Amino acid sequence: MHPTNTPAVLVTGVTGRIGRLIVDRLLDAGLPVRALVRRPEAAATLPARAEVFTGDLTEPESLDPALTDAGAVFLVWTAPPDSAAAVVARLAARVRRVVLLSSPHRTPHPFFQQPNPMADLHAHIERLIAAAGPEATVLRPGMLASNALAWWAPAIRAGQAVRWPYGTAETAPVDDRDVADVAARALYDPDLAGGDHVLTGPESMTQAAQVRAVGEALGLPVPFEEITPEEFRRVSEGSAPGAVVDMLLGAWNAAVGRPAHVTTAVADLLGEARTFRRWAADHAAAFRPAAS
């Protein structure tokens, strides 16, 4: 537990996969938590113990109430870059520590070196933070395990084959819970201050093997059918921006037949890194067909 006079931690991106988990971790650690939401109705999804503030990264002055007397900020940049400099300047003037959720764009593995507009934006935010001077920790998760929910759960729940490109592309999915655990510690543990951590899962797995792992968690066969990049583009129309689809296809193509970049950062910081198989077992209910 932490002293009652501990400065509050402001968490952005609280309706997202990582931010929501961080709120829980910080509250469990006894820290006062402020949650930034764009819409007041989003407060209904958050724990009552979290103090909710309405603000928008595109309107830097709207952050001032949430930043007053705060000690640290978890920053997920979800806005266009136009307001980034003004937001970072406000953070640097008001809080001691910033933990940024970025990406592994500095990692030389070809998977992370494909054209990626989001990685370019992350690099821009990193430069702004470095110039502004707050104590900063940068977290660089690779592929999140929870992507499987959006990508494959609809087909599996419907009892269908997973139709996906580049089945032999290898990634090392990192459990969202591990990312949140590292981020929460970085927000209050001085030993993690100033770090730069590439966070991956502990094992390189092909995409087809990841689908099989979900099937094993369900105790059901889940067929995997390879489709072409062109077909993937067609079926993705309307559900994902073209730039994102191109980025994914380029990254997967670069990862075919090549072991994924695997780090020990999660285990070094937490003692253990959750495997994708463990993630699949813990989330099997989200994939289970209604009739099974």
Q: Where do the protein language model's features map onto the residues?
A:
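Oxidoreductase cofactor-interface core, primarily capturing Rossmann-like NAD(P)-dependent enzymes
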Residues: H2-T45, T58-E61, P65-A70, A79-A86, ...
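A general structural signal marking secondary-structure boundaries and capping sites
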Residues: P190, A255, F287-A290
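Amphipathic terminal alpha-helices
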Residues: L269-S292
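Hydrophobic "lid"/C-terminal helical patch
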Residues: A183, L187, V214, L248-W252, ...
